[in-house]
């Protein structure tokens, strides 16, 4: 198993697919990395040489923010919104949908399981 950006990449898969196992790299960025490094798209991870793995590692470290750094930046952005007290920050703080979705019905994923209200009847 190759290890890139702290993630074990599955050896049997094509490199383009295997790179998407890294948080912050989707299909588009994976293909972009392959084009930069010059590795054919149909090549599988177990066929990569150590030099090619090193090239991929360096390309990711140089050009992309992935894994822990990306997660940290995302959480810091959310924390900043919450500290500002803006509308989006309040929605994050209250655990409600942030992007304008309705909450009268639905939004159960964000709000959690339904809570029974004592004394309320239909």
UniProtKB/Swiss-Prot annotation:
InterPro entries the UniProt entry points to: Rbsml_uS13_C, Ribosomal_uS13, Ribosomal_uS13-like_H2TH, Ribosomal_uS13_bac-type, Ribosomal_uS13_CS
The keyword rRNA-binding is assigned to this record: yes
SUPFAM superfamilies: S13-like H2TH domain (SSF46946)
Coiled coil: none
Region listing for Disordered, in residue ranges: 99-122
PROSITE patterns according to UniProt: RIBOSOMAL_S13_1, RIBOSOMAL_S13_2
Keyword Transferase recorded: no
Function: Located at the top of the head of the 30S subunit, it contacts several helices of the 16S rRNA. In the 70S ribosome it contacts the 23S rRNA (bridge B1a) and protein L5 of the 50S subunit (bridge B1b), connecting the 2 subunits; these bridges are implicated in subunit movement. Contacts the tRNAs in the A and P-sites.
Record note on quaternary structure: Part of the 30S ribosomal subunit. Forms a loose heterodimer with protein S19. Forms two bridges to the 50S subunit in the 70S ribosome.
Family to which the UniProt record says this protein belongs: Belongs to the universal ribosomal protein uS13 family.
Name of protein: Small ribosomal subunit protein uS13
Organism: Agrobacterium fabrum (strain C58 / ATCC 33970) (Agrobacterium tumefaciens (strain C58))
């Amino acid at each position: 198993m190759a290890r890139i950006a702290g993630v074990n990449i599955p050896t049997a898969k094509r490199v383009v697919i295997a790179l998407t196992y890294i948080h912050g790299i989707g299909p588009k960025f994976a293909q972009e990395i392959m084009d930069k490094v010059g590795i054919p798209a149909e090549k599988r991870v177990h066929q990569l040489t150590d030099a090619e793995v090193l090239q991929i590692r360096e390309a990711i470290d140089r050009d992309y923010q992935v894994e822990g750094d990306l997660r940290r930046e995302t959480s810091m952005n959310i924390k900043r919104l919450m500290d500002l007290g803006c509308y989006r920050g309040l929605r994050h703080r209250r655990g409600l949908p942030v992007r304008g979705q309705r909450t009268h019905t639905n939004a159960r994923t964000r709000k959690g399981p339904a809570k029974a209200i004592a004394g309320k009847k239909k």
